[in-house]
Structure formats: C-alpha cells, structure tokens
C-alpha cells in the first residue's frame, strides 16, 4: 500500500513509520506546520508542533530512507482548533483541542489530501486498535497498553476515516518497548519526553493565554443559594471542578474547600460549592458521531423520523469524559429534544442520554463523552448538560452562552 506517515517529531510516530516501512509499504513522511510563527508554539522537552519537532521528524525519515515533506496547515489549524478553543471558552464551555485537532486536522484535512494524492492510508503513532469485523466493518478499540491507550482522543473518527487509518503501535505492550525499539534503530528521539500540554499555549498558562484572546469582564462568584462570596476577573477563565484561583473572601461554613460548579457566561457568574456537589449522575450529549456502525438500538432509532420525546431502547456502555479518566458503567439511549440553539421554532436536536451507575465528578459542558462497550469505542458526543441528584442540573451552556460566543 501507499502510506502517508504523519510525523509529529516524537518517538511514537517514528516507530510507527518504521514499522510501516518494514512491512513493505511505500511510505512517505509528512510533518504538519500548524503555525506560521513556530516560536509562538511551545518549545522545549514537553512540547509538540515546534521547529525542533520538524527537524526530528526529518532526521527519522532520512534514516528510514523515505521522502519527507512539511505541509502548511496553519490557517486550517487556527480556524478549526485555535479559534474554536477561544469561542468555546467564551461561551463557558471546556473544549479539548487535541480531539478537535484529530477531528478537523489529522483525520480530516490530512486524510483528505492524502486520499486525493493517491495514498491508501494514514499512519500515526497513536495507541489504539482498528479491527475489521467478519462483515467488513471497521471498529476502533482500546490499545493493548491501557496506560497509554489513546482511543478516547480518537473517538471523533468516523467509520469512513477508520477505513484509512492505521495505528502500528496498537498491540505494543508498553511505551518502554517503543523507546527500546527506537533506540535500537538509532533514532535520536528514543529518549525524547512525551508532550502533554496544549501546543499553542507557549507557557502552559491557559488562563493567561485566554486573557490575551478574550475580553474578560469582572463579575461575581456565588454559591448555589445565590449568596455573593467574591469576585472574579472573567468567568471564561474558569472551568467546572476548578479549585485554585477562586480567591474567596471567607471560608465555607463547614470549613471545606469550594469548587467551581458552573460557569455562566451570559450572567458573567461563577457558581461554587462543595466537592460533593460536583457529582453528576446523568449526562446529555449532542453532535454525536459513531466510530463505526452504530449499535443496534441506535441504528434502529436513527432510521425513524424525528419526533419530540421519541427515544431508543437503552444499551449498556461505559462512559469516559477525560483522556486519562477511568470509564464508568452506564446505560445510554438516544432521544429527540428541543434545540435551544435553533432559530426555527419547534426545531429538534438529537441527544445522547447517559445514566451513570456510578457518579462522575466535575463534568463540564463542552467536554467530550466517549462511549465504549468492552474495548470497543462506540462513538462520542459533546456534553451539553449534566444532572446531579444533589442539586439543580448544570445549565445548558451550549445555549445559555450563545450570546457571548464567537461561533
């Protein structure tokens, strides 16, 4: 096959490309330039998307004896990832830019160009498995090494994209083995540290970066009863579950720390409360995509006409709302609900409702909820609302924040 290897400049993509070459494929390496001013992206041992990374990727391709190119995706990255990140925070939501990058850049823009140029598949260094079923369908599964599993951030991929995705590290037992293999091959990136932070925030200080990109207005910090506890420099700088940086005027009556429960951009308010009030028992997600063929209950429901209140049969899942969080057992169903974002009266939106058998803490609107059955990724949706048995539901910031959003 003709393979395009996405070269990040790290050890994982280097070994993935090497395995593709050894498998006998025609491999071409490409590094994505995501900024026209690389100095504005993180530099150093924990970064990604830097000039150093580009040079590391070039050296690996030279050692493998394969062609190497740099593709300028900076404008697309700014529009689809950076601008989206800003507008989501403006609306009081907590986005995941790495998932947006996978969805819009690595497995949309990159794959589209690769297919147009005659490539059969794109190879990356992600830790996840793609399985072809007996009936020819493609499924996304967790990697063999659950400690490094990245199926969560790949939950945005569609069935069509999975047809052209290859993850050679899928069955590698550990990251240590990948590094050992890289060292044996003489790759200089064998000991290069992993990158963890957001690549376009140079110093890793999200609040300071947002302050340079969003107009912040001072406002009030309140408890769940509406009592004013303090002031904040801008509601958009806070996220659900946050404890640090609240600067409250006095301690809680019970002496326990307080956490952000809600961000209300329309009112420019931050609502705080005890850790116990962060517990969420039901989540509603929108903009669902399926990583393969939808489960039977959802597939049947999606064939029926949209009708307010209609719902599918329940199906058992495990739900994960953060990249490295433990999944929790749940029951899910699809339903048609009023669309608060639509201008047309009576418009409906499709929602994924997940009832958690064990509560989750600190679920924020805007986060991605990925559903699994066993090791298989069913799909994902963007969290619109979360409900707690202990307090009123977190308001739907996908509509409440619309007046301040740049969408």
Language-model-derived ranges and their functions:
Residues 11, 123-407:
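AMP-forming adenylation/ATP pyrophosphatase catalytic core
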Residues 1-155, 175-177, 260, 393-404:
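ATP-dependent adenylation/nucleotidyltransferase module used to activate substrates
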